[in-house]
């Protein structure tokens, strides 16, 4: 089984936890391809799709008798397509076809009834190409960043509450979005200390989230015959639909002094009391994910100073070198864009004011957050950062003059 890392890895080292509920599941056997002929593997199997804690979508097949998961593929939107094979006489053979390369995986339906075959196929394609927003399972499969995507209770809490310090810094920390033009001030000086983060995040073995999905498919030694699936298993089952996880919030948190580090438990408590509306409150909503496009970020990320500040916060591991190219890959990854879209929607909801106050941000920024005015919030943070930038420039100039006087 082959897996790859992501921008937001599981919080438990070495763990890739997931919800007990699968997004979609149905009984199906595998088929082996030899030349132009496919042969059914008569073992009882289960095809299922699940979203792990790192928000990645996994397409899996397991042996129902042994319980062994033999195929576990990490799929990104537009990687592949699941469709029926019309050449099969029974009409119950489906193929997972990758758009890049010639990789194909064949399966034959083992459900006793055929009436759900097309529905299962539709759901597979929906979840593979339009993964649900983190914490909003059970909502529509749309991959957009509308405020409604925050879904029921716990959507926002699940996203931010499950992030480590370093992950939060990637969203709003001085070494995360810091330096990105006018929006760089979303960070604010000293936010790292407020979050209790004193250094780069710990290492975690991972690989590029943009890499092609891969899996090791066990070889099957069976005689080659035309595709004729074995009879379906007699037992009945139905696909389980995901349901939103209940909110784990425990009420409002006590106000912390701006000089005290804010822990993740404080963030969870604050977010637990929020009521994110199902739609925009009115007016034009600014989506940071649509603002920070690859075209806009490219010249900024070409700046060596910006690269130097961002590199320590990249996921690290043997298969993922910390390079300038990986900065681009990370900031354009689906996971980062999803998180950025949700943060933008939450900010526009007008309910992040108390949280920004906890960060010790300037009054103008807190007021803008209370109003849900993303543009005013960015300007307030930018204006707040200018005096410190001038102070730094003055200090550098003074040091330069001292060096010259020594000469």
Swiss-Prot record:
Give the matching Gene3D superfamilies.
1.10.2020.20, Proteasomal ubiquitin receptor Rpn13/ADRM1 (2.30.29.70)
Q: How is it modified after translation?
A: Ubiquitinated by UBE3C in response to proteotoxic stress.
Q: Where in the cell is it found?
A: Cytoplasm; Nucleus
The biological processes this protein is annotated with in GO are:
proteasome assembly; proteasome-mediated ubiquitin-dependent protein catabolic process; transcription elongation by RNA polymerase II
> Where does cross-link Glycyl lysine isopeptide (Lys-Gly) (interchain with G-Cter in ubiquitin) occur?
34
**Modification type Phosphotyrosine: residues:** 127
Post-translational modification N-acetylthreonine, affected residues = 2
**Regions of compositional bias (Basic and acidic residues) in chain numbering:** 387-398
Say which domain of life the source belongs to: Eukaryota
Point out residues bearing the modification Phosphothreonine. 217
Task: Identify its protein family.
Answer: Belongs to the ADRM1 family.
Its function, per the record, reads: Component of the 26S proteasome, a multiprotein complex involved in the ATP-dependent degradation of ubiquitinated proteins. This complex plays a key role in the maintenance of protein homeostasis by removing misfolded or damaged proteins, which could impair cellular functions, and by removing proteins whose functions are no longer required. Therefore, the proteasome participates in numerous cellular processes, including cell cycle progression, apoptosis, or DNA damage repair. Within the complex, functions as a proteasomal ubiquitin receptor.
Record's subunit section: Component of the 19S proteasome regulatory particle complex. The 26S proteasome consists of a 20S core particle (CP) and two 19S regulatory subunits (RP). Interacts with the proteasomal scaffolding protein PSMD1. Interacts with deubiquitinase UCHL5; this interaction activates the auto-inhibited UCHL5 by deoligomerizing it. Interacts with UBQLN2 and ubiquitin.
Q: Which protein are we looking at?
A: Proteasomal ubiquitin receptor ADRM1
